[in-house]
């Protein structure tokens, strides 16, 4: 027996857990390719559908976020109650279907309905991913896990800008681009079913060394708790400063990121006279560097915490840099008339912005793993309700003022809120767990 244990102790752990999170990164990227497809195709849709005012464009963008937001808490509960593998696969296949169906729409109403369907079906992915993180990654790996889980946003936005502008240019049709994006989504959803497993023990590719590494790390942090949660279970947590700051910070961050994601294509075209090709290239550069910055932030967070640094010092420093750089970059961009400087400043603003992704790991880090799906679902519900309202507000701002200046100031102000809320989170104080 001792010989066997000795052999196992020398065995190199497999990296199945990281392969799963790379697949989640791919799913997240496709998620955002499908989301951003509307913004990329909007000039063509506006011309074809006869849409002239920015407020209608804002309302069409918000259709996705309303349904996505309303499904966040139910999706978090699904992640806590059912198998994550099944939820991820079903959600991906269904949202791919809605993306493809969008190509058949000939009215604003029908297109809005497909965006609503897209929002409903995409909603379970992030809560399910947060649940996977709690069962597959040790606490010192969750910073990188969070960045991979949430890294699909900038990566998908960057790739979507290039891919969709190329498809539209090549085929001369935004409709064909939508169909190709939808079918590709369905294919990746099926791949996820064949590779992802709910726990490390279920995966045949996990060797004993990797299993021991995961289980030991999780047990040292207090273990995982299996508990089926109800909607009302979140209510006692809403009196805690950490939870309120978590929700508020994520809402402010979402205002900045999703505001830029939705409106930067139109901003570059209308305020700086970019053509579609130039806009696609600029979007690719900005959001690809945002993705790279996000991954760097994850590595810094994990290595810094592994060195024994206090959690408050690590996360407060990273989140402060993220918020301040984003806010200053957006403010300077709004006051610049140079197209080149606009792209440079927005790129600087976006580079550390996604360090906010550590928010996904906070419930687990603060000792609320059994409520991770429900808390992150609530957090995402609030932020996406914000994201649903923001396109409408910005659309009316642009329509009333005739420029993007007020909108950019709005995003810079939201960055200040993101900073304040992040500083209020006490990472050294666990959440007070509520018992039935």
Across the structure, where does each feature detected by a protein language model lie?
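Glycine-rich segments within core transmembrane alpha-helices of 12-TM secondary carriers
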Residues: 143-162, 168-169, 185, 290-294, ...
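Cytoplasmic helix-loop-helix junction between adjacent transmembrane helices
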Residues: 114-154
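Helix-breaking motifs and short loop linkers at transmembrane-helix boundaries and internal kinks
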Residues: 51, 83, 98, 104-110, ...
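Extracytoplasmic gate region of multi-pass secondary transporters
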Residues: 38-39, 235-297, 353-356, 360
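C-terminal transmembrane helical hairpin of 12-TM major facilitator-type secondary transporters
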Residues: 312-359
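Extracellular/periplasmic helix-loop-helix junction of adjacent transmembrane segments
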Residues: 39-70
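Helix-loop-helix hairpin linking two adjacent transmembrane segments in secondary transporters
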Residues: 149-203
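Conserved MFS/SLC helix-loop-helix module at the cytosolic interface between two early adjacent transmembrane helices
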Residues: 70-109
């Amino acid at each position: 027996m001792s010989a066997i244990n000795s052999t196992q102790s020398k065995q190199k752990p497999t990296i199945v857990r990281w392969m799963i999170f790379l697949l989640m990164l791919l799913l997240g990227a496709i998620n955002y390719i499908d989301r951003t497809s509307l913004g990329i195709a909007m000039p063509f849709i506006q011309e074809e559908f006869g849409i002239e005012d920015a407020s209608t464009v804002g309302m069409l963008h918000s259709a996705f976020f309303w349904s996505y937001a309303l499904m966040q808490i139910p999706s978090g509960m699904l992640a806590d109650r059912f198998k994550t593998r099944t939820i991820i696969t079903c959600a991906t296949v269904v949202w791919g279907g809605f993306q493809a169906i969008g190509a058949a729409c000939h009215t604003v109403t029908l297109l809005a309905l497909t965006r609503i369907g897209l929002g409903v079906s995409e909603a379970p992915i992030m809560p399910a991913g947060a649940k996977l993180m709690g069962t597959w990654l040790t606490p010192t790996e969750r910073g990188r896990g969070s960045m991979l889980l949430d890294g699909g946003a900038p990566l998908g936005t960057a790739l979507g800008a290039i891919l969709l502008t190329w498809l539209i240019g090549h085929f001369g049709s935004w409709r064909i681009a939508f169909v190709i994006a939808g079918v590709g989504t369905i294919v990746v959803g099926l791949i996820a079913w064949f590779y992802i497993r709910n726990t490390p023990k279920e995966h045949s590719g996990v060797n004993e060394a990797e299993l021991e590494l995961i289980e030991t790390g999780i047990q040292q942090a207090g273990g995982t708790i299996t508990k089926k949660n109800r909607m009302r279970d979140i209510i006692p947590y809403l009196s805690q400063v950490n939870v309120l700051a978590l929700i508020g910070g994520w809402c402010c961050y979402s205002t900045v990121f999703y505001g830029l994601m939705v409106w930067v294509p139109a901003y570059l075209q209308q305020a700086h006279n970019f053509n579609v090709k130039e806009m696609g290239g600029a979007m690719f550069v900005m959001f690809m560097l945002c993705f790279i910055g996000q991954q760097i932030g994850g590595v810094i967070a994990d290595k810094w915490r592994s060195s024994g640094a206090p959690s408050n010092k690590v996360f407060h420093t990273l989140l402060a840099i993220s918020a301040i750089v984003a806010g200053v970059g957006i403010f300077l961009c709004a006051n610049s008339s140079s197209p080149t400087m606009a792209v440079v400043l927005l790129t600087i603003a976006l580079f550390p912005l996604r360090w906010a992704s550590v928010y996904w790991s906070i419930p687990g880090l603060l000792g609320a793993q059994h409520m991770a799906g429900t808390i992150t679902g609530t957090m995402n519900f609030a932020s996406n309700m914000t994201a649903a309202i923001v396109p409408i507000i910005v659309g009316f701002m642009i329509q009333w003022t005739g420029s993007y200046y007020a909108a950019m100031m709005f995003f810079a102000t939201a960055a200040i809120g993101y900073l304040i809320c992040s500083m209020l989170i006490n990472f050294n104080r666990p959440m007070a767990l509520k018992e039935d």
